[in-house]
Amino acid sequence: MLSILSLIWNMEITYLLEFTHRAQLRKWFEQHAASDKECWIAMYRVRRPAECGDCLPYIDVVEEALCFGWIDSTLKRLPDGRLAQRLSPRRKRSHWTELNKQRCADLEARGLMTDAGRQALYNSSLIIHHSL
C-alpha cells in the first residue's frame, strides 16, 4: 500500500499555468474556477530566484485562490528550479487555518473576495460579514 507521502511525491503536474501578473491569475479564476478541478501555478515561495523570471509570489497565488473558494495544497519543485503549487476548489466543511481566515477578512476589506469565495466561507461556517 502506498503511503500518503508517496502519493503526493508521485502526483503528476498535469495542468501547469504560468503568469507574470496577479491580474492574469485572477482572470483565469474568473473563467475557470467554477468548472476546473485543479491547476498548478508556477511560483516562488519567499525570494524570487533568478530562474523564476517573472513568475508570481506565493502570497499572490494563495490570496487569489481564496478569493474564488480555492485552496493551495501540494508544492513540488519543477526541473528548472521554480515551484509548482497545486490549487483546487475547497471542499465543504474543510478545515480553515487561522491565517487563511485572516487573509479572507483582509481580502474582503480590500474588495477582492468573490461570491464563490464567500460561499466557501459560508459552507465552512466561517462567515465574514461584509457590506453589499
Question: How would you label these PLM feature ranges?
Answer:
Residues I4-L132:
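Charge-dense, helix-prone N-terminal extensions
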